A protein has these predicted regions:
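Short amphipathic alpha-helical interaction segments
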Residues: 127-138
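A short, conserved structural fragment
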Residues: 141-149
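Short secondary-structure capping/turn micro-motifs that flank functional sites
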Residues: 36-39, 137, 155-156
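Accessory beta->alpha helical hairpin/"wing" motif in late/C-terminal subdomains of nucleic-acid enzymes
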Residues: 150-159
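Conserved small/polar residues in nucleotide/adenosyl-binding loops
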Residues: 163-167
Length: 167
């Protein structure tokens, strides 16, 4: 099976060729693996990556409200049983502040615009550097991330590493 899969170098080459072709046809990359013509970006995806609360309705749906994750059952019988008791979901899990920070970072770094240091402070009451300073510095030294003004984001090499690492 492995001989059927492209090498990591070939994956990066295909990724960069795809990006070049899409750019030539007017598509912009707004997330590490999503392209759209300006104004046609997925609002759902951008909301998810921006850590905006959302409500999922129906079988196997998930929601994120008030820093909690909610999940509906994937089995129809279980779903109908829960609904008959007046419950709207199977389980809820509150995220710790650290888990919220982690999600803010890894979801936000998927966007080509990256993440705002100011927004991190407003959301969590501490600086991004105080929590992730060592990792940020090391990633920047390795050329995987960069900082411009208030924003931190992945470089092209950082995107390729993330894209090829099954992250």
């Amino acid at each position: 099976v492995e001989e059927l899969l492209p090498s990591e170098e070939d994956e990066v080459l295909m990724y960069r060729m795809t990006e070049k072709i899409l750019n030539e046809y007017g598509y912009d990359k707004y997330e590490i693996s999503n392209y759209a013509k300006p104004g046609f970006e997925s609002r759902h995806n951008l909301g998810y990556w921006s850590h905006i609360p959302y409500l999922g309705v129906g079988l196997n749906a998930s929601s994120y409200l008030d820093e909690k994750r909610f999940e509906n059952p994937s089995d129809m019988k279980d779903y109908l049983e829960i609904q008959s008791f007046g419950d709207a979901y199977e389980g809820a899990r509150s995220l710790s502040v650290y888990e919220q920070m982690e999600e803010f970072m890894f979801l936000g770094l998927r966007k080509t615009k990256g993440i705002s240091k100011k927004e991190f402070i407003e959301r969590f009451g501490c600086s991004m550097d105080s929590v992730y300073g060592k990792q940020l510095i090391e990633s920047m030294k390795q050329g995987m991330m960069k900082e411009e003004g208030d924003r931190v984001f992945l470089t092209q090499d950082g995107i390729c590493l993330l894209y090829t690492s099954d992250a």
